[in-house]
Amino acid sequence: MAVYTEVSPAEAAPLLLSLGLGQLQDIAACSGGIENTNYFVNTDQGSYVLTLFERLTFEQLPFYLHLMKHLAQNGVPVPAPHAALTPGGGIVHMLKGKPASVVDRLQGRSELAPRSAHCAAVGDMLARMHLAGRDYPRQQANLRALPWWNETVPVVLPYLNPDQSRLMRSELAYQNHVAASSAYQALPRGPIHGDLFRDNVMFEGSGDSLRLTGFFDFYFAGWDSWLFDISVSLNDWCVDLSTGAEDSARAQAFLGAYQSVRPLIAQERSLLPAMLRAGALRFWLSRLWDLHLPREAELLQAHDPGHFERVLRQRASHPCGVPG
């Protein structure tokens, strides 16, 4: 959550009033993330997150915001966007010439050192999210899927050493081969989160009282295979951050909980190793892009691309499948 566009209290207050959210009390910039401008805002009625979208357009945003609304209405703990009090009640707003949204701030905290119980809770809720999205009527492609990889790899290759370049080229060729297979075409699809990392989930309590209070930051969502979404999550929740190696206990907890809600089909089970590599490639590539071709922003904290290079090498050399 970088800050590309500065918003003053005087600029934020009228928007909050127009949404019926009360009088602004304070506003504070969020420093995490890299895509959009985010502020925590408190009013006399509650706590919210104000987002100004720096890349997504007014035409693209309804997919994301209405998806959040749809999921919230179907029992998934997601912060629903607030609509204007005017006739029509739009949920995409304008602030400082940019599209904006306001959502409730979730209760709880992120768990940056998850245990198996956290991974099981995420796996369970991700499966419920996938099922809840089956009847979502809007479709929009995952904007960071294979077509984007094919476009972006040539842009980042000049910044890589020869060994990294060989890995990048060979993995991209492999993923294009996988995507052309009949097994890949048979994968179940629907809206995915696309970025369900440790810092995009909130929890309360511990032990037997542990409770997942919400998923957030859906702005990399899109229409894609559910297996890709699972793989992105496994590559963050269930790996050792220092080595990139899989933590088998956490992975089994995640997949077991997911499958208790939605069992994987045969093609998903066979392609999980390939999709784990795909998830690692996607974030290695996007982090290289953000590092070497940055945008100007206050509080910008670029993520280390080396982490997902390590994950990709681990996934390629030590394929991990579905337990049982």
At which residue positions do the language-model features occur?
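Conserved NTP-binding catalytic cores of kinases and kinase-like/nucleotidyltransferase enzymes
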Residues: 1-85, 205-209, 319-324
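An alpha-helical support segment within catalytic cores of ATP-dependent transferases
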Residues: 7-18, 137-139, 152-194, 198, ...
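Active-site acidic catalytic loop and adjacent metal/ATP-binding pocket
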Residues: 31-44, 49-50, 81-84, 177-228
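ATP-binding pocket architecture of kinase catalytic cores
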Residues: 43-137
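A cross-family kinase active-site recognition segment
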Residues: 112-166, 187-189, 299-302
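ATP/Mg2+ or Mg2+-diphosphate-binding catalytic cores
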Residues: 154-155, 283-324
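Active-site activation/catalytic loop segments of kinase-like enzymes and analogous catalytic loops
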Residues: 227-263, 278-294
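All-alpha amphipathic helical-bundle segments outside canonical DNA-binding/catalytic cores
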Residues: 264-276
